[in-house]
Amino acid sequence: MESEKEVAQVREVSMVKPNYMLMSLQRILVLTVILAGVLVVVHYTPMPEEYFENCDRECHELDWPMICRVKLVIEVYKTLSKSCGSCTEKDGGDCPATCISADGRERGVLVANRALPSPTLHVCHNDILVVDVVHRAPAHALSIHWRGQPQKETPFMDGAPMLTQCPQPAYTTFQYKFRASAVGTHMYHAHSAADAADGLAGAFVVRQSARLDPIKALYDVDASEHTIYVSEWGHSMGPLAGVISRIPNAESLLINGKGKSSESPDAPQSSFNVEYGKRYRFRLAYGGGSKSCPIIFSIDHHVLEVVTLDGHQIEPQRVNSVELGRGERVDFIVDAKKVPGVYKIRVAAVKSCQDNLEGVANLVYEDKKQKVLHKDDDKVDAEVSRELTTVTSDRCESDNVVCLTEIHAATKLPVELTENLDKTIYVPFNYSTRQISAKRVESWGQTDGHRFTYPASPLLTQGGDVGANQFCTKEPGQGDECVHVKHIPLGATVELVMFDQGGESDHIFHLHGYSFHVVGMRELHRSFDSETIKKMNEEGTLFNKNLVDPVEKDTIVVPKFGVVALRFKADNPGFWMMRDERSSHWTRGLDFILKVGEQSDFVQAPPDFPKCGSYVGPEYFLI
Ligand SMILES: *[C@@H]1O[C@H](CO)[C@@H](O)[C@H](O)[C@H]1NC(C)=O
């Protein structure tokens, strides 16, 4: 009996006391192994690209257009962040992709996806872009302009604040959705020039099927890595800096976000690789910066065969250098046929705007099997000694300088734009600075006597909220501040004659929604009044117009005391800004708006389109 009891007890004891310690250790071990396995698998699984649905591909005319999803996270960031280490110093190693080296100096940057310049977008013609702008930079009201895209189906996606949309407040997301309908090398940038100069700008390339490209025979390679974005770099402009009359000098020119300064001569430079014997199509966009001086671009010992301007094809021009104003783009072809090596790509600001403002990059011949070189390969192109410039000046008379008026478009001026135009609009503008005391300079900017100001609500999407008293009068003003709108009937053929009365410097204007044919351009060397200009234009003594094959552009450099005549057919209804590109922030008074068509002609924004106007205007009291 007793022994039975004992046995039972022993059994009980052994059942009651399993080894808990060991069991939990085993479980922990098993769980750890599983967890480690999961981590290994996750670690080695390639993550889908977070920001881009990559539309950078070979374009084919029979392919369906793609939907290109882009997420642009806008932040205040800095150059030389931790990840850079000492990569901008001598023997500091390569800079990691996450490092913004700029010109090797520390500075705040306004970035999209922590990149400088903003990531280049490559799409095919007719792709649909869906761009989420996630705005995380306090104190900036943003809108992004897609330069070069007419936005005919979606005028409310043009990114002009208070015209086509309410500027986006910080900590919100705005979705741009539009069709890339205009082929060519373009740009996208913050509407505010200060924000663009602080980094929020990049290249935007719309390619077409090689079979549809009329100049395909001229090149072998059109690759995304041969896109060049040049920008001015210097002191941050900040929202208030734009208000001062004297803009500080820029300090360097960056090529694809890289350059050097005297302080850091070892900062990395951009390189563009080529193989001997191939012809490369390069795409160049100049985004400007705080000062936005015109720049001269060249590649040592290489000829640039310029084939497009602002995305429009021209009769090819073989030149040694190209001079561009802010916002202009060119495509050129480089025949890589020099003694393989490294050649300098140079940009320099025009001296009359700022001396000693330069940037460099490298053209690198990849070390593939070297071809036998003919001794005179180097000489062939030395015969070319010409410059192409979009900036008209006295130099145009020289045989070695090809100016805009001497360049021929690849296509003829449409017949309806050759004569009997429906409307001619004369637009005098005057930007002048005056020394008002030994220390102070004051500036005035007016177009037609009106100082441009933005309306309180976006004209296209909330036009009804804008009081009639905010608009400028039709007659020339007396320096009044108002919303300057010029009305054009839908479908009219238009000639816009713009002329500079101030004579301070060149001026650059960019038209949204259209590109125009530059039928006339000239320096007048002094101020003329509207009556005289009108008379001269009607008599045909103002210019020797090119009504056969003038170049087509969307950005124009109006020479100092100069006049230009721009023609287009007003077939894109909406509110389109003629933007003064030298403005360092939102405006300095020279901008104006073209209202094409009537409210009923406008493509309506979707009903849930974000709106301005929950704030009570300053003239109301809540109590
Ligand atoms: C341009 O503006 C300045 C400053 O307001 C003025 O002194 C000058 O007379 C103007 N020039 C013309 C041609 O209107």
Language-model segment annotations:
Residues 154-173, 304-333, 477-482, 548-565:
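A cross-kingdom feature marking solvent-exposed beta-strand/loop segments within repeated
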Residues 98-125, 259-273, 461-493:
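N-terminal edge beta-strand
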Residues 133-137, 284-288, 497-502:
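Asparagine-centered strand-capping/turn motif at beta-strand->loop junctions
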Residues 304-306, 311, 469, 484-485, ...:
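Intrinsic, low-complexity N-terminal interaction/targeting segments
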Residues 45-124, 129-132, 137, 142:
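Signal-peptide-cleavage-adjacent N-terminal segments of secreted and extracellular proteins
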Residues 2-82, 193-239, 314-495, 499-506, ...:
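Extended terminal and domain-junction accessory segments
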